[in-house]
Every structure is written in structure tokens, then in C-alpha cells.
């Protein structure tokens, strides 16, 4: 098995050399991606896309046409796509980008396996939701039978009266040195976080909701499982909970799982929606990143030149990430990963707690895709949750 790394900048060069992986700095653009990738990608190959500002939709179609498998951790447009005002906010939202991928699912129903969003969240969060529902079913309904279809899963969530699903995350990792003035730090991709934090806030919108946000907007196309607000997610706070932190205020950052999970667990009678849970991300990053966000917002959303991913500098803390299922008979139930920096370093080199959770989700998705190479375009919710967790759990 041959591994090649194609990247837009030299970060990660030393790690690639350590593992004997060929490392090439060649940024992909709308103009050159076919020319660059055609010599590298053929039938049976696997393209793992962990970049930003590279169109997931274009790369997916490229791979399917060549019989190659594909996995991404989020659906990205080309550089500038998030801010292209010639396209409506609805069309360039995560909801709109997902609908473009859904169109490819219909276009290539029996193509090579493509999982456009499978890291930790989106990705593992979908499997934690399902395991959480099984556990609640055992406790509340006194049965733990695994649903056999998407419709069965949705009916189980409705029967349990789950109203809201949070992707709830609290990062308590601490680094030395910490954030400096005019520097943006984070425990994972600064560019990735800033990109999604600057996008309009998006959330799956449940049937139990009795009001509508003043700045809320509905989509006029697609599955209509989600809404968006006319302000950046990094400016919106929501209350959530994790076992170690307890209650906290997190940022309602747009994420693919908010849209796909609310869609997956929708119950319909004909064209009428009978049940759908509200679903959103509630993210409290590490405290140094919160300081970075405050500075970023205060500078009118202008990103400083200095950016740093906190990796070797982290000396304590953990990342708690999981599914918080709310509204049922038990009130609320959280199921997920509580990974400390010390555990992460014992499990895998060159990682912190956050990056290892993502890497575990990526690895599980890649293995499942290779075991099921002709499934077409799949949401994480379409992946076998038991197999995915079996693969990922040793690293969580």
C-alpha cells in the first residue's frame, strides 16, 4: 500500500518523513486539480481530503468518475466560496453544500464509496447518537434491539421523545506558552475553525420548537431539515453540558452533523414532517482559543497574521466531545469521548486530545469505506455505527 501526501504548505513535513510518506507541496485550485490528481488517482485508490478551501464536490465527482473512494471531514468550497456574495447565503451555507453532495448521491447511486463528512464531528457524533439511543431504549423502553433501517431509527428517537441533540464539546487543554497578543491559537486547524466560525450560524430545526428566531432564515430547497441565522456562529452562544465540565456556554458553530442528523431522524407521513429533533453543535474551545475569538471579533473579524496550532505546548487538560440527547423521560443523556492529553500521547504520537479524536473518526471511516467500496455517497449516519465505534474506541 502506497501513501502520498499532497499539501498546500510545508506543515507536517517532519511527521511525513518520520513515517516514510512522500510529501509534496502543491496547492490544489479550481484550475489545476484535475491535472495534479489524474496521475495519482485511479480505480480502487483512496483520496483522503483533509484540506480547506478545496471543493469537496469537485473532488468527489472526480473520484467517483475514476472509481476511487473518498473521505473528507467537512464539505468545503473553493477559496472564497463562503464569502461569494454573488451566491445566496442559503446556497453557500453548509446546508447548501450538503445538498450539492446529495445531488451527487442521486447522480451516482452505485458509485465508489464516498463519505464527505467523517472525522469526530461530523462523523463519530452520529454513531454516539445511535449508541445513546440504544442505551436510552434499554433504560426507558426496556428493550435494546438495534433498529434495522433509517425509518426505524427515526421512529425510535420519536418514541423516546428526544427533542434536542447537542454535539457538545468542551476543550480544557492548556498550553505553555499560551496565546500571545495578535495571535490566533487553537488545538486544531486555525483556518478551519475560523472559516466555520465566520459562517452564518446553522442548526437542525425540530418539530417541537414553538418560536422562530428573529434573524432566522429557512431554506427554499432540499430536505429543509435546518435553518440559519444572519450572524456568524462565533457570535452565538448556547447552553450545553458535558460530564467533566457540567453546564457551559458554547458557540453555536455551523457543522454538517447538525443538518444530517436532523434529516436522518425525520419521521414523515407522506410529505408531512411528523417528527424531527433540533440538532446543533455547542462548542467551548480551549480557553486560549476563546481569547483568540474575542480578539478576532473585536478586530471586526479580521484574522491576525500569526496563527498557531497547540500541540507539543499542551501540558494538561482534555477534550470532552459527545452527543447530548435531551427531552426524554430521563431529561438528558450524554454519550461520547473524554480524552486527556496524557492518554492521547500514549496512544499516538504527533497528536493532542482534539486531533486524535478526529484522526480516530477518519481512520474508522476509511476502513469502513474500504470494507464497503461500492456504497455511493454516504452520510456518517449511513455508516455501520457499531463497526465504526469498534474501530475508533481504542483511541478515544
Language-model segment annotations:
Residues 6-10:
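Residues in the short beta-alpha loop(s) of Rossmann-like NAD(P)-binding domains
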Residues 14-23:
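Short, conserved SAM-binding/catalytic segment
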Residues 25-42, 55:
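Conserved Rossmann-fold cofactor-binding substructure of NAD(P)-dependent oxidoreductases
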Residues 28-30, 46-56, 67:
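N-terminal glycine-rich "phosphate-gripper" loop used for MgATP/nucleotide binding
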Residues 54-65, 73-112:
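Rossmann-fold NAD(P)-binding glycine/threonine-rich loop
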Residues 88-161, 361, 366:
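Adenosine-phosphate binding glycine-rich loop
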Residues 135-396:
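C-terminal catalytic/substrate-binding lobe primarily of soluble NAD(P)-dependent oxidoreductases
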Amino acid at each position: 500500500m502506497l501513501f502520498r501526501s499532497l499539501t498546500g504548505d510545508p506543515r507536517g513535513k517532519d511527521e511525513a518523513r518520520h513515517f516514510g510518506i512522500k510529501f509534496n507541496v502543491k496547492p490544489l485550485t479550481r484550475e489545476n486539480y484535475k491535472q495534479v490528481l489524474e496521475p495519482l488517482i485511479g480505480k480502487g485508490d483512496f483520496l483522503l481530503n483533509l484540506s480547506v478551501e478545496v471543493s469537496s464536490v469537485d473532488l468527489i465527482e472526480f473520484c467517483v468518475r475514476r472509481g476511487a473512494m473518498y473521505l473528507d471531514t467537512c464539505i468545503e468550497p473553493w477559496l472564497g466560496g463562503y464569502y461569494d456574495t454573488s451566491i445566496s447565503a442559503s446556497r453557500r451555507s453548509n446546508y447548501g453544500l450538503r445538498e450539492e453532495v446529495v445531488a451527487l448521491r442521486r447522480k451516482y447511486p452505485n458509485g465508489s464509496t464516498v463519505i464527505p463528512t467523517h472525522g469526530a464531528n461530523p462523523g463519530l457524533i452520529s454513531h454516539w447518537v445511535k449508541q445513546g439511543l440504544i442505551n436510552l431504549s434499554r433504560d426507558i423502553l426496556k428493550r435494546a434491539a438495534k433498529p434495522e433501517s433509517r425509518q426505524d431509527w427515526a421512529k425510535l428517537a420519536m418514541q423516546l421523545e428526544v427533542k434536542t441533540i447537542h454535539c457538545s464539546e468542551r476543550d480544557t487543554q492548556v498550553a505553555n506558552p499560551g496565546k500571545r497578543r495578535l495571535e490566533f491559537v487553537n488545538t486544531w486547524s486555525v483556518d478551519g475553525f475560523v472559516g466555520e466560525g465566520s459562517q452564518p450560524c446553522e442548526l437542525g430545526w425540530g418539530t417541537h420548537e414553538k418560536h422562530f428566531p428573529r434573524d432566522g432564515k429557512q431554506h427554499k430547497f432540499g430536505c429543509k431539515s435546518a435553518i440559519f441565522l444572519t450572524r456568524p456562529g462565533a457570535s452565538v452562544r448556547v447552553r450545553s453540558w458535558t460530564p467533566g465540565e457540567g453546564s457551559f456556554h458554547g458557540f453555536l458553530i455551523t457543522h454538517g452533523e447538525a443538518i444530517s442528523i436532523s434529516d436522518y431522524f425525520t419521521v414523515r407521513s407522506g410529505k408531512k414532517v411528523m417528527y424531527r429533533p433540533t440538532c446543533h453543535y455547542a462548542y467551548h474551545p480551549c480557553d486560549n482559543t476563546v481569547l483568540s475569538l474575542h480578539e478576532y471579533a473585536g478586530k471586526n473579524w479580521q484574522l491576525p497574521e500569526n496563527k498557531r496550532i497547540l500541540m507539543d505546548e499542551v501540558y494538561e487538560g482534555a477534550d470532552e466531545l459527545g452527543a447530548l440527547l435531551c427531552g426524554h423521560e430521563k431529561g438528558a443523556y450524554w454519550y461520547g469521548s473524554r480524552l486527556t492529553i496524557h492518554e492521547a500521547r500514549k496512544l499516538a504520537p504527533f497528536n493532542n486530545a482534539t486531533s486524535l479524536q478526529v484522526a480516530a473518526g477518519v481512520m474508522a471511516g476509511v476502513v469502513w469505506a474500504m470494507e464497503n467500496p461500492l456504497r455511493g455517497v454516504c452520510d456518517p449516519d449511513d455508516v455501520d455505527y457499531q463497526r465504526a465505534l469498534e474501530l475508533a474506541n481504542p483511541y478515544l
